[in-house]
Amino acid sequence: VYYDLYVVLDIFSRFVVAFTVAASEDSLLAKELLEQAMGVHGIPDVVHADRGTSMTSKPVAQLLVDLGVTRSHSRPRVSNDNPYSESAFKTLKYAPAFPDTFGSLADARAFADRFFGYYNHEHRHCGIGLHTPASVHYGTATEIRAQRQATLDAAYTANPTRFRHRPPTPPKLPTIAW
């Protein structure tokens, strides 16, 4: 038995703004998930999606047109057209706790709840300066980066010979998604 995982991902912060697990692909469920995500996090300028039947459906297309959102879809038969989403799904599938099978739809949903809580609030992502998606999404990453810089400055001041050539700096924050 396979279940379908729907994920709405903010590609700038890598924050999963909404998700659900369903027994089958459903265009109305995809539309409802997008409405939920946009109701909480605002209406984006662009929604980039795969070419699955639910994301190319009339209900989803009409919702995006009504909201003035530009639709963008992956190229046909190009699996790596959305590296942000691909990275999130790889992190999910390679998580040590990812089971071989789910006993039920409820089990799959419970796993998704736990995983995306971890992913958003604990997982340090190299593409966003080793911050959590939540810290970038909610704007606390700049302060955290400043604290990291202060720690590195203190380490450099205490022992400059430990560092070659120049003082260390923390990884940079993203400035633009695409």
Stretches found by the model and what they are:
Residues 1-178:
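Charged DNA-binding/catalytic regions of mobile-element recombinases
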